[in-house]
């Protein structure tokens, strides 16, 4: 019934944050906007009979997004070019798979280039993976991180993935593991999860 677009800072079109909800009809849109603008009742003062939120995008952020939409095709073409470079450069490297569209029937914008490393692939420095605790945010991520006592968790990328990340970091090339499965996040350890092992495998072998 709804479509969701992300305009986060790392996306093809960004408003510095936030996104958009695509609604099928006016009734749904009005209901969503009611919740997104604090769910106020029709009184000359603030009256709330349901919990509302302040989720509406500011006009400044929306203006940034509208401006970027005029050059969306340029962004897409650039990302496709970057993807083509990775496919060319890694084509002859045994043990590395570049994720790409399965056929010409698909037209990916390649907002994110990802690879998968076979667990048997050896990377220089692999023996030192996870020996040092991370001190700063990884892969261009902003914000403050919470200090930890160990570099190891019960679900983490394979040693060769971490070794390649560190190697690229030292070469000033931004890279990071793919997203950790939600059911493996400690904060959700007691939440129900329906899994088959695929997400864990992708996390252990993937890099973007």
Language model features: what each stretch is:
Residues 26-208:
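PLP-dependent aminotransferase class I/II
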Residues 2, 17, 31:
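Short acidic donor-binding loop at the edge of a beta-strand
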């Amino acid at each position: 019934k709804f479509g969701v677009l992300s305009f986060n800072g790392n996306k093809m079109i960004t408003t510095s944050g936030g996104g958009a909800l695509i609604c099928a009809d006016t009734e749904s849109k009005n209901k969503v906007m009611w919740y997104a603008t604090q769910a106020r009742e029709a009184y000359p003062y603030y009256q709330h009979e349901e919990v509302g939120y302040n989720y509406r995008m500011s006009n400044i952020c929306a203006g940034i997004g509208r401006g970027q939409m005029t050059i969306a095709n340029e962004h897409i073409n650039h990302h496709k070019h970057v993807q083509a470079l990775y496919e060319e450069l890694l084509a002859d490297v045994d043990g590395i798979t570049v994720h790409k569209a399965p056929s010409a029937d698909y037209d990916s914008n390649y907002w994110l280039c990802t690879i998968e490393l076979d667990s048997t692939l050896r990377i220089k420095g692999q023996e030192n993976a996870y020996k040092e605790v991370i001190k700063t945010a990884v892969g261009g991520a902003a914000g403050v991180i919470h200090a930890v006592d160990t570099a190891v968790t019960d679900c983490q990328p394979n040693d060769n993935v971490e070794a390649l990340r560190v190697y690229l970091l030292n070469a000033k090339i931004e890279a990071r593991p793919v997203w950790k499965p939600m059911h493996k996040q400690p904060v959700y350890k007691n939440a129900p999860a329906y899994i088959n092992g695929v997400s864990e495998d992708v996390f252990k072998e993937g890099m973007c």
